Regions:
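Alpha-helical solenoid repeat scaffolds of the TPR/TPR-like class and their adjacent stem/linker regions
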Residues: 1-152
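PAPS-dependent sulfotransferase catalytic domain
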Residues: 102, 106-134, 150-257
Length: 257
């Protein structure tokens, strides 16, 4: 099955390059259907997880924990949907002498999972356990993140952590690293969703193999980003991919500022 859907995606790209769009779409459709049949992705679970995060991470929740966590401003998180221009933003930032580019770092999800494991099965799971984190724990988690990511740095005062799915973890990031910068790489719904549908990911992104499901996930992403803007006003810088392509110079200035 893997060989079949890999071939479908490759043929879809080759036909698209030849402007054979009907045939190309049919190859993508078949490849996605084969890949989706192997997965256990549950759209309802994704929706509930994001609703749970939003219900816990309120303005008052963050106000009660103001200036908790590790105060260092070193990380610049690039988040958003896959295929939304995050790599371009990373390249722009990494061209600055004060910023180190890195990899797609798994440390934020891993730390969240580590905390969940510490609590054991008798306690609520993540994110319901976020209110249980005490001030000293948040600082420890922030310092742990900086220590574990140090291996990827080359001496610049700032570094990039580009893991698009971290848009779901902005609340956790703010709790442990309140002075970290966060950039949302955003792209129009049609281009972003179809870009996901055409791409065979090496791992993860299980929402992307069905057009309805990727559209629903994009809506969840936008809703959660709107929530972060409401409860953490000014925390996230939103950069539209189409705007960067149309006017690179002014957007580069905006990003670097």
């Amino acid at each position: 099955t893997q060989d079949r859907y890999s071939l479908c995606f490759a043929l879809g790209k080759a036909l698209e390059d030849q402007h054979e769009y009907v045939e190309s779409f049919e190859c993508y459709r078949r490849g996605n259907a084969l890949k989706r049949s192997e997965l256990r992705y549950d759209p309802a679970k994704s929706r509930q997880q994001m609703l749970d995060m939003a219900s816990i991470c309120t303005r008052s929740f963050f106000a009660q924990r103001s200036a908790w966590g590790c105060p260092k401003p070193d990380p610049i998180f690039i988040v958003g949907m896959p295929r939304s221009g995050s790599t371009l933003l990373e390249q722009i930032l990494a061209s600055h002498s004060r910023v180190d580019g890195t990899l797609e770092l798994p440390d934020i999800p891993r730390l969240a999972n580590l905390y969940r494991a510490r609590q054991g099965t008798s306690r609520p799971g993540y994110p319901a356990n976020l209110p249980l984190l005490e001030r000293a724990q948040l600082r420890e988690l922030g310092e742990m993140y900086l220590e574990e990511t140090r291996i990827h740095r080359r001496g610049a005062p700032f570094f990039i952590d580009k893991l698009p799915n971290n848009f779901r973890e902005i609340g956790f990031i703010h709790m442990i690293l309140p002075n970290a910068r966060i950039i949302d790489a955003r792209r129009g719904a049609m281009a972003c969703c179809f870009g996901n549908f055409k791409h065979l990911f090496a791992a993860g992104q299980e929402f992307s193999y069905d057009l309805r499901e990727v559209g629903e996930f994009y809506g969840l992403y936008r809703d959660l980003m709107d929530h972060w803007d409401h409860v953490l006003p000014g925390k996230v810088l939103h950069i539209q991919y189409e705007s960067v392509v149309a006017d690179l110079e002014s957007n580069v200035r905006r990003i670097l500022e």
